[in-house]
């Protein structure tokens, strides 16, 4: 997904599993240390904004890194028109606005983002996300609220499904996720949250004829509901979350959905998101990045639309090479590696090669029996040299002719 937007601030929520889509500047999230280069080194670099200024012969003052201006005043950007693309949505028109401020000079920037998206497939997405920091970053409050009308594909359960099994599920949904984290040590946080997900007007559209679908076997109902507290752990040593060149990231979310909170039946889930970034070679600006994303149903039976699935992570980035929703099951394990390298010395152009593998448990045995690999390559175009935000254009391949274009603002992980 991509948002063509030149604003400085967006927000990235790390609140839990994701079944409600988001089409905004997701990966170009607010960084906890926005100043990623000195003015001298930044001005040696080139980005899209520099090129546009040169083309229009801009006489505006020399650009500054607005991310280092620590003001308590709320700065608002927008509304701004934009455009996006994903395999699930096709092209999309977007209107977005965001704001930022510093609660204290010694705190990370607090940010808010909202948008309205209408897609070529008649889908509607309206998120509101916020990330607030207190003095000395002692507390972090994360909010992720969304409304969607999002008809999209499902292919059934497990790893043996085929592309011909696919059909549309029509639904509307809201999610109300929020969490409060407290600093335990440098770069380490833990806290508690509350997540509510509600789906309604769920219906199958032109399912395979003369066949009982996996959704019907699993339990097709016109509504799905999940409510529960979350227990969160976060460890993040990256200096730049938009385009990391080193460090580690670990995010663990345990979510018990108990009947006392209105669930039809109790079920529990666990998400473990781990990433590592290594400069390779060490003296270069090239980066070797690894990502592990495991999404497990510990016990009980999750609603069908809230089960682990391809592209079901918070920013719909797992499984490049396959359409989101291509595989689905009670448990998912995922691993990806990517090599990111410069093409031009001025940083304007870069490239990547990547490979991933995902596996889902079979419904009948609850065992992992198949692996779906994905692989591909892509280009990077530097949009903002101060935050190192790239426009990412990747083409991914999967098994049995699967493939497509994957577009992001910022790195995939």
Question: Which residues make up each language-model segment?
Answer:
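Gram-negative/organellar outer-membrane beta-barrel architecture
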Residues: 69-78, 83-225, 326, 389-392, ...
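Transmembrane beta-strand segments of outer-membrane beta-barrel domains in Gram-negative
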Residues: 17-20, 26-59, 65, 153-282, ...
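Outer-membrane beta-barrel initiation region
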Residues: 15-142, 219-245, 330, 343-350, ...
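Transmembrane beta-strands of outer-membrane beta-barrel proteins
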Residues: 77-79, 110-114, 139-143, 190-192, ...
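Sequence/structural signature of outer-membrane beta-barrel proteins
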Residues: 100-104, 117-123, 148-152, 199-201, ...
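Bacterial Sec-dependent N-terminal signal peptides
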Residues: 1-20, 278
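Flexible, surface-exposed loop regions and adjacent strand-edge segments
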Residues: 159-163, 206-215, 268-271, 304-313, ...
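C-terminal outer-membrane beta-barrel translocator/porin domains of Gram-negative envelope proteins
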Residues: 240-344, 349
